[in-house]
Structure formats: structure tokens, C-alpha cells
From Swiss-Prot:
Mitochondrial membrane ATP synthase (F(1)F(0) ATP synthase or Complex V) produces ATP from ADP in the presence of a proton gradient across the membrane which is generated by electron transport complexes of the respiratory chain. F-type ATPases consist of two structural domains, F(1) - containing the extramembraneous catalytic core, and F(0) - containing the membrane proton channel, linked together by a central stalk and a peripheral stalk. During catalysis, ATP synthesis in the catalytic domain of F(1) is coupled via a rotary mechanism of the central stalk subunits to proton translocation. ATP binds at G231, G232, A233, G234, V235, G236, K237, T238. One of its GO terms (cellular component) is nucleolus. Residues 1-51 form a transit peptide. Residues 1-20 have a biased composition (Low complexity). Pfam families: ATP-synt_ab (PF00006), ATP-synt_ab_N (PF02874), ATP-synt_VA_C (PF22919), Synthase_beta (PF11421). One of its GO terms (molecular function) is proton-transporting ATP synthase activity, rotational mechanism. Transmembrane segments: none annotated. HAMAP family: ATP_synth_beta_bact (MF_01347). It comes from Arabidopsis thaliana. This is ATP synthase subunit beta-2, mitochondrial.
Amino acid sequence: MASRRVLSSLLRSSSGRSAAKLVNRNPRLPSPSPARHAAPCSYLLGRVAEYATSSPASSAAPSSAPAKDEGKKTYDYGGKGAIGRVCQVIGAIVDVRFEDQEGLPPIMTSLEVQDHPTRLVLEVSHHLGQNVVRTIAMDGTEGLVRGRKVLNTGAPITVPVGRATLGRIMNVLGEPIDERGEIKTEHYLPIHRDAPALVDLATGQEILATGIKVVDLLAPYQRGGKIGLFGGAGVGKTVLIMELINNVAKAHGGFSVFAGVGERTREGNDLYREMIESGVIKLGEKQSESKCALVYGQMNEPPGARARVGLTGLTVAEYFRDAEGQDVLLFIDNIFRFTQANSEVSALLGRIPSAVGYQPTLASDLGALQERITTTKKGSITSVQAIYVPADDLTDPAPATTFAHLDATTVLSRQISELGIYPAVDPLDSTSRMLSPHILGEEHYNTARGVQKVLQNYKNLQDIIAILGMDELSEDDKLTVARARKIQRFLSQPFHVAEIFTGAPGKYVDLKENINSFQGLLDGKYDDLSEQSFYMVGGIDEVVAKAEKIAKESAA
């Protein structure tokens, strides 16, 4: 306040001197006054003096007030100058001019176009000066014209969260797109949030048991980790995703969120229908029993929507983690399309591209998303991210930047799928940072490495077998091949979500039982059992029972 008084006295004396000089130079001018036609220097000094003599603001303007983490979304922002007008439209980029600086929205604030046929939300990205902001449209700008009124909502894009979102499909703005009515909830969160503070993070490394044998044994998922899922069309990626959703819900009581980033509309619809058929999503009165929420930003939508839909899905998952203490599974398909959408937005905003045409902010854009996916003292978000590798070039900046964030990779192989072994996870190509004796313990680690060694030896012998046949192998090699083929088939497993297709009941295999079963295989305890008895079963007890059944049927 003292500095304000000093500034006021200095400005008064300065403005008085300036005005006196003007009067002396031109006797016809009247005495100085804050009239509209006063000299520019005198007028500006007068405005600054007026600011200096005014009382300091008691609180920040509503537009700059931080958005609350929770509370129903409203659009009743009534600050001075809250209405702007569209002054330029270039595709998905819209410039909006406001009357004065008081109504100027902060970066990341959402604006709504008024009197538009459909709801059109804009997100502030740049301040250009002259009270003009550059925004990214979250929907198509067809029919938008200059001069159209735009409302400053005073808050970032805010979406519904909580259990009411389970079994529902939302878009980037949190609007339901499944034609099943409004999402009724009292909980809303902004999509732009800071990553959890360092003091809130859980420091321990812990396995997230999935009940899937090949995953838990050879490439275990970290609780709160990030997993890259590599798989082409028709190798069982969708079924594996649905089984993970089902098993996490049963074993950990957690929920799942599926974020379709640049998703094909047909694939998104197919996934939704399959989830209904398999019981992951329930309709009608049983909707509250659903285990998954879906957030789609379809391939035909503008880049702004595709660049933000991943954040919308993550926000829904964060609520389950922070408010309900859940272990949440977050699926992002495809993380490359998230990067691609941000690249399109960056080009439209006029940024100079970086290597291979990607945005210069590639690492920070991806890091802002990935750093929010973590384990806290309240709960965890474990992310499974489908990754597209352009032209199979792993050195491309987009996948290379993504790999730096991953804790595990699950590779689905077409060769294994062609053998009829599902899940078609490649046990040699799939990796995990958790595969360490310090984290898993000696027993689990040694069993996993033993299984991989047998499978690798079998792979090395396949060329010899193809040329010379099994008879030319040594006795040790024959034993290796026999055990490897049994291990390969034992890695198959019937899924709960596939019961309606296969007729076989799904199996959830406990981690301890899983380790003991494969250790018994490596020790040769089950060398006398046929390969067929290891196919599509749960634990080793089922293998023994199936072998006895086969023996009885063959003897009959």
C-alpha cells in the first residue's frame, strides 16, 4: 500500500508537469482534463495514476480464480466483459476478441459459443494481445461466423466423474453419447490437473495380479505402472483387454476406464457391444454393477477433441483412485493417436515443427499425461496403452518418447494366435521392469527365467526339427522340446469374458499356484502327461484331472 502511495504522488506530479507544458505550448488548449482527446502521454499517465490511487482489489477476478476439484459444473460466470466475439476462424482454431482485459480468460479456460446450432466449446491456448485469445475447438467449426458471441465460462473443461459414469460412453466434454440419458452425478472435475505431489506417491513396488498366467509369471504388471500393448488385428487384443477389466474388478474391487483416442467408430461400437455381451457392462437397473466407463474421441472428430479425450478418461480414473481409493485400470487406445492429434493442433497454432514433423512440445505433452498415471497412498492407476509404431520404426520420436514411460510391454503374436493358443502373448518378446529377484523374490524370478530359457532353446531347435526331424535330436533336446510344448500350451487359459463364445468356464489363477505349477513343469514332475491335457486349463490340478479323463476315454 505504501508503494502504491509513492507511485501515486510521482505520477500526479509527472502528469501535472506534462499537462502544464502542453498548455504553455498552445494557449488555445483548455486546462488539462481526462477528456477523450487529451494528449496520449497525458491520458496514459492519467490512467496509471487512476490505478495507483485506487484501492487494491480484495480478491482475484472470478475468471482467474482456481477451479475447485469438485462441484457441479456451472456456466453462470458473470464477470465484467465475459462476452467476447469470434474474430477469426481457421479450421479448428478460433480467435476470440474480448472488450477489455477484465473479461480475458486465462490459458486452458473453456469458452462456449452462443447461439450456435450445437454446443461448441473452445479451449484457450494463446493470448495474442489486443484482448484477443486463440482457442482450440472441441467440435467442428462448420457454420461458425465472425461476430458470433462467445461466453467465458471461467473454468477449464469440466466433466462428470464417479460411479454414475460406469457403463456409460462419454465424449471429451463429458456428454453422454450412448443415447441413454443424462449422467446424473454431483461430482465434477476439470480435465487439466497437476500430477500428484511427490509426498503423496507410494514408494513401494508391488505386482498387480491379473489372474492371467502368462502375464503374471513372465511380464508382471506393476501396481500403478504403465504397460504397452502391441497387437495387430485379430490376435485377441480386445478379449485380453476385457479379461483384464473383469479380473481387476473381481480381485481388487477396482474399476476400469477405456479411453478411445482417435478410435474408429466401428471398433468403439464393437467393443461396447462385446462388453455388454460378456457382462463387463450392464444395462438398465443393473447399470451400477458395471465395471467400466468409456470415453471416446472418434477418428472423425477435430484434433482438439482427440488431443483432450485422453485427459478426460484419465480424470475419470483419477476420481476413482483419489476419492474412492480404488485400483483403477486405464486403457488408452491408441497412445500414438494422442501424440498425432497434438501434432495437428501444434501445426494449426503455428508452432515450428520438430524432428519428423512432430510438435516441439512432444515430450512435455506426453509427460503431462503419463505423470498423472501413478500410485498414490490412496490408490493406483495402472495404464495399458496400445501403441502403434509408424512404419515399424522404433526410433520414430512418437513411440521412442512413449517407451521411456513404460514399465512393461505385452506383445501379442500372430504366430502364437495361429496355433490356437490364447491369450496369444509372446513369452519371449514381452518384458517387464518388475522381473527382478529383488521385487518378485528368488522363486518367482528363477521360475520365470527357467520357463523363458526352455522356450528359447525350443525356438533355436525349430529350424533343425524342420529340416532333419525330431529323430535327429539328442535325448536332452527331445526332453527340452517336450517340456517347451507343454509349457506353451499351459500358457493358454480360458477367459471369463469368452465363455459365451467357447463354452469353457473362465479361470483366474492365483500367483502362488501359478509359480508352483510352472516350477513343477521345469522339474519334470509332469513329463508323463500328454500335451493335450495342458491346453486351455487353469491350475496344474486341472491338468492332472484332464489327463486322467483323457486316459479313461482312450481306455474305454
